[in-house]
């Protein structure tokens, strides 16, 4: 089994790190460069920067934050938010990022995935999928052309959302994951909108369904509240990596504690 990764996520708005619940109610969590350095020292395997205002408010990319971070941080850095073109990819990678994450742009122009992976290599292309449960009655299952799964409280399919979780697309997340793999993406960053910020654990059913439908590495995101949740994402969700924000930003747990919890239970982790 490959080493599982712990990835702090820094949601950035107006050049500051913020953390919200279900994509709303942001509260300031600090300076991105300082936090990135702190997590690098703490033993994070990678970092994700998401400029959460960029796609929705058409804000330009946070190039200077990326440049300042890349000078001080030597673990892989993924940057997303507001990336719409090959030129945006080029600028982000030139600023020092290792990978670029796209969500809204990928849904609106799937060919961008193919183009970017051909030009920069699929290892640089991360497709972020923000998904939400769409519940259906049992008697409707055969009538809708979606991957309906049984969940704790009924039946649902998982719908892809864009513009920072604000707009539904009608697209089935399982089908979309298969499509982005076909188009040449190197990794999927999968966020459960239902779980985001709740600290009640990842959506293990969503994570498992996506993980088993593709060969790509899947990063579980949304809902991490304690080390046990990370362990569950790896064991039951079949995730390759776990993304988290609030529990780290507010020092509820350290990366070392999370890694040790998983390693003690047989999960291969890179320990300091």
Curated annotation (Swiss-Prot):
It comes from Methanocaldococcus jannaschii (strain ATCC 43067 / DSM 2661 / JAL-1 / JCM 10045 / NBRC 100440). One of its GO terms (molecular function) is lyase activity. Keywords: Amino-acid biosynthesis, Cytoplasm, Histidine biosynthesis, Lyase. One of its GO terms (biological process) is L-histidine biosynthetic process. InterPro entries: Aldolase_TIM, His_biosynth, HisF, IGPS_HisA/HisF, RibuloseP-bd_barrel. Heterodimer of HisH and HisF. Gene3D superfamilies: Aldolase class I. SUPFAM superfamilies: Ribulose-phoshate binding barrel (SSF51366). IGPS catalyzes the conversion of PRFAR and glutamine to IGP, AICAR and glutamate. The HisF subunit catalyzes the cyclization activity that produces IGP and AICAR from PRFAR using the ammonia provided by the HisH subunit. The keyword Cytoplasm applies. This is Imidazole glycerol phosphate synthase subunit HisF. The lineage of its organism: Archaea, Methanobacteriati, Methanobacteriota, Methanomada group, Methanococci. Belongs to the HisA/HisF family. Pathway: Amino-acid biosynthesis; L-histidine biosynthesis; L-histidine from 5-phospho-alpha-D-ribose 1-diphosphate: step 5/9. It is an enzyme of class 4 (lyase).
């Amino acid at each position: 089994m490959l080493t599982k990764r712990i990835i702090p996520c820094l949601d950035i708005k107006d050049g500051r790190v913020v953390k919200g619940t279900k994509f709303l109610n942001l509260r300031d969590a600090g300076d991105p460069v300082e936090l990135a350095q702190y997590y690098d020292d703490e033993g994070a395997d990678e970092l994700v920067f998401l400029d959460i205002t960029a796609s929705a408010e058409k804000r330009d990319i946070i190039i200077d934050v990326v440049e300042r971070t890349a000078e001080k941080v030597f673990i892989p850095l993924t940057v997303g938010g507001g990336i719409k073109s090959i030129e945006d990819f080029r600028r982000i990678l030139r600023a020092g990022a290792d990978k670029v994450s796209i969500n809204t742009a990928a849904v609106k122009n799937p060919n961008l995935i193919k183009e970017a992976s051909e030009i920069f290599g699929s290892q640089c292309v991360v497709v972020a999928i923000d998904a939400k449960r769409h519940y259906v009655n049992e008697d409707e299952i055969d009538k809708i052309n979606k991957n309906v799964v049984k969940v704790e409280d009924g039946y649902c399919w998982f719908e892809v959302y864009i513009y920072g979780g604000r707009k539904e697309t009608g697209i089935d997340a399982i089908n979309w994951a298969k499509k982005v793999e076909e188009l040449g993406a190197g990794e999927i960053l999968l966020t459960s909108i239902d779980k985001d910020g709740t600290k009640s654990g990842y959506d293990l059913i969503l994570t498992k369904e996506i993980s088993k439908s593709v060969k790509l590495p899947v990063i579980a995101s949304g809902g991490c509240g304690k080390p046990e949740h990370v362990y569950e994402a790896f064991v039951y969700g079949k995730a390759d990596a776990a993304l988290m924000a609030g529990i780290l930003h507010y020092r509820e747990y350290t990366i070392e504690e999370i890694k040790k919890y998983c390693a003690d239970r047989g999960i291969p982790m890179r320990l300091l």
